[in-house]
């Protein structure tokens, strides 16, 4: 209450009392006048007390406001001086925001500059083979039916202060991409996953994206990465057309630039063009040791990989992608005990229910270096999608190990694939410029008995070939086999997180016993498999 209001109230009370006093005096009542004076005195005391209390409250409020303003100014000054906060300005809002983009639990600060999200994928395969060895000398004589938890990954991804990105993802799957086989000591497995490796760390990296040169986005990253060096590898396993990638692309990637790979490098991209290069080491699934027995292993390898790709044409309902890549094994793994430097090129028959590799060069001796070069093409026209890659491999065998064969000539291998799909429900594959590859399908009408949607349905076909034979008929040749596989697929995208994949494969694998022995040890097979996929 203001001083003027107190004064007005006092004047009114005094006037009223004065009137009453005059009336009492006219009546001659002295006692009543005395009582009224006493009441007036008490009211004056109360008014003085209220006025003093109001003035004190106003002073306290003004002091608190001044203190708050000073604290805000000091906090802003400290924040602006900190190197962790590059942009000067007011204090960012406090609190967190919880969201579920594509059903992925995500927590961010209110300014969106710091986030952490949980990510996971489950790929569970069941299937069987009709396997037919050409002769009794063929190895193997049968392939096992059954199931395989192909991938079972869970981890966290996020960012700090907008530009620092990270991921930590572990794979509990039964035949993960980076698992190269169980090592052993004197024929006894050395205590890790059957058919697996010493580590299931699929991603553990840090990436900086603060630089944006030439109107694009630059990512500088290092750690354990999924390297988008081939078109097939740049496509997420959640988005590939078939349960497995083509053998030619798998062999090209696993030489130096697949996932689970230790690497450091950079990639630049905009809406049209992508370019990247990395220096690479071993995968987390490899044992690198100077000893051959304790534990079994070899020294670390050194490699490098580059890729340039882009969407050269795009418009309403259509797109065309072209690209090329190259990978270099600069320093192969070296066994410090035996002196051996070897390289093996091999793959499973585009299905991993049974992990047997039907084509393999075996351990190529005296490898000093190796290279592979690839060309890629992909595109869309409405619901139609196509993709293809072809690879050429060179293996140099002039390492000075002192082991036979000495002075062996260079080896050459090659292979590729072509695949296409048609989405029966009309959706199209969208382009992902950050990886220079295509996303999978997101159904326009997710399956729902209540809502009447049936998801998205896609039919697909692929033919792939890989030739691991060279210099047959000579002592320095390699008889790794030649594999051709025809695959038909049906994909049901239930919603943005669940997919079912049905694949039928027909394979022909002609192979001879060795480079100098033409005895038939080839095989043929048919296989049917179903994948249940959950991802977020």
Label for each model-derived stretch:
Residues 188-193, 208, 326, 336-536:
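Outer-membrane beta-barrel pore domains
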Residues 19-21:
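N-terminal signal peptide c-region/cleavage motif recognized by signal peptidases
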Residues 1-9:
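Bacterial N-terminal signal peptides that target proteins for export
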Residues 13, 23-123, 130-137, 209, ...:
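N-terminal periplasmic/intermembrane-space "pro-region" immediately following the signal or transit peptide
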Residues 89, 100-332, 412-452, 456-473:
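Outer membrane beta-barrel
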Residues 53, 60, 67, 114-119, ...:
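Residue-level detection of beta-strand scaffold positions
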Residues 32, 44, 72, 202, ...:
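Acidic-residue sensor for enzyme active/binding pockets
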């Amino acid at each position: 209450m203001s001083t003027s209001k107190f004064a007005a109230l006092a004047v009114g009370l005094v006037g009223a009392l004065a009137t009453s006093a005059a009336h009492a005096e006219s009546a001659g009542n002295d006692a009543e006048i005395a009582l009224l004076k006493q009441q007036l005195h008490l009211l004056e005391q109360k008014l003085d007390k209220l006025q003093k209390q109001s003035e004190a409250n106003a002073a306290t409020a003004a002091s608190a406001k001044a203190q708050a303003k000073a604290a805000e100014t000091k906090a802003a000054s400290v924040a602006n001086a900190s190197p962790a906060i590059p942009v000067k300005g007011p204090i960012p809002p406090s609190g967190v925001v919880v969201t579920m983009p594509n059903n992925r639990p995500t927590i961010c600060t209110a300014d969106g500059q710091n986030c952490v999200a949980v990510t996971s994928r489950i790929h569970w395969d069941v299937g069987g083979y009709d396997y037919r060895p050409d002769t009794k000398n063929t190895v193997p004589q049968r392939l096992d039916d059954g199931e395989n938890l192909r991938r079972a990954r869970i981890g966290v991804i996020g960012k700090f202060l907008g530009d620092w990105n990270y991921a930590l993802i572990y794979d509990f799957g039964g035949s993960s991409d980076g698992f190269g086989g169980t090592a052993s000591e004197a024929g006894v497995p050395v205590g890790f996953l059957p058919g697996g490796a010493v580590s299931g760390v699929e991603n553990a990296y840090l990436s900086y994206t603060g630089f944006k040169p030439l109107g694009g986005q630059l990512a500088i990253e290092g750690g354990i990465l999924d390297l988008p060096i081939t078109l097939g590898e740049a496509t997420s396993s959640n988005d590939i057309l078939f349960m497995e990638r083509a053998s030619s692309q798998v062999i090209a990637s696993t030489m130096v630039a697949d996932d689970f790979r230790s690497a450091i490098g950079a990639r630049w991209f905009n809406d049209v063009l992508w370019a990247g290069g990395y220096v690479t080491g071993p995968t987390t699934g490899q044992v690198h040791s100077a000893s051959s027995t304790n534990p079994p292993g070899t020294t670390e390898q050194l490699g490098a990989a580059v890729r340039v790709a882009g969407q050269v044409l795009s418009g309403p309902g259509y797109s065309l992608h072209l690209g090329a890549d190259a990978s270099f094994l600069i320093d192969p793994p070296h066994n410090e005990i035996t002196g051996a430097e070897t390289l093996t090129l091999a793959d499973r028959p585009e299905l991993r229910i049974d992990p047997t590799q039907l084509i393999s060069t075996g351990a190529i001796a005296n490898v000093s270096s190796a290279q592979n070069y690839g060309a890629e093409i992909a595109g869309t026209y409405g619901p139609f999608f196509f993709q293809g890659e072809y690879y050429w491999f060179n293996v140099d065998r002039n390492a000075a190990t002192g082991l036979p064969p000495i002075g062996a000539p260079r080896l050459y291998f090659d292979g590729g694939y072509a695949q296409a799909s048609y989405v029966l429900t009309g959706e199209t594959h969208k382009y992902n410029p950050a990886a220079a590859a295509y996303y999978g399908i997101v159904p326009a009408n997710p399956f729902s008995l209540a809502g009447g949607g049936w998801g998205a349905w896609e039919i697909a076909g692929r033919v792939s070939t890989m030739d691991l034979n060279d210099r047959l008929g000579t002592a320095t040749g390699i008889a790794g086999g030649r594999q051709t596989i025809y695959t038909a697929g049906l994909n049901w995208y239930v919603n943005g997180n669940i997919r079912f994949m049905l694949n039928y494969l027909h394979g022909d694998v002609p192979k001879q016993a060795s480079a100098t022995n033409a005895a038939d040890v080839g095989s043929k097979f048919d296989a049917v498999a179903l994948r249940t996929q959950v991802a977020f």
